[in-house]
Amino acid sequence: MKKLENKVAVVTGASKGIGASIAKHFAAAGAKVVVNYASSKEGADKVVNEITKNGGTAIAIQADVSNEADVRRLFEETQKAFGKLDILVNNAVAQGYAPIEQISAEAFHQSFNVNVLGPVLTIQAALKHFDGKGGNIINISSGASKYPLPNASVYSATKAALDAFTIALSKELGVKNVRINSILPGATDTEGAASAGVTKGSDYEKMFIANTPLGRRGQPEDIAKAAVFIASDDAAWITGEQITVSGGMYGF
């Protein structure tokens, strides 16, 4: 039996990068997957097509995780399509990087609305759809929550808030048999990282690799494989944890 056989999972921000990889790996592990996206329908459809081509089951649903009505619709459509919900992965992210002097109030609120309010809204909605057997929540945080980088003050603060939220909720939701954990990726090769200037051969990439004991940047599948484990019954006694997946970069 596959690790996530008969499970239904919602993965937010799953049209590309880490979210897309998690969706694909969940499907390969037997889960029925909702590929959520905010604006990239083409990317989400591509992920769904790849999953179905490989024998999996997935649908794409548009929703802005910072919009309460959108979030409510996301989970109602999931329930209608698959009849239940077992796993929620909060991966949708606003990655704004700038010196503190250049951060506008609008950019600040956008980051917190997506990175912090978004998980609040999705978790509230998910709790209404988990059956009496409990559920599983994975928040995709960042190593930047523990080791912030220059020009990433607001982004780092949102992820630190998400980690605190995860720990607090583990104490609140354990009695409902709902597990919740954070995964803190290290320097991972994604479109978001590239938009922040961490491109192949850049000084940023060289710095990250030099400080990573395993000598390379992570790939989205490195994070996805950890997510499959945390989502599975193999991790049944793991909750409230901040699980670093960084090639050793944040192992100090």
Which residues does each predicted region cover?
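Conserved glycine-rich cofactor-binding loop
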Residues: 8, 15-16
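Substrate-binding pocket helix/loop in short-chain dehydrogenase/reductase
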Residues: 99-100, 107-112, 204, 208
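Active-site helix of classical SDR
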Residues: 123, 158
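Alpha-helical segment proximal to the catalytic Tyr-Lys
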Residues: 128, 171-175, 236
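Residue(s) in the substrate-gating loop at a strand-loop-helix junction
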Residues: 142
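Short C-terminal tail/terminal secondary-structure segment
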Residues: 147, 228, 239-252
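A glycine/serine/threonine-rich, flexible loop-to-helix segment
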Residues: 175, 187-212, 222, 252
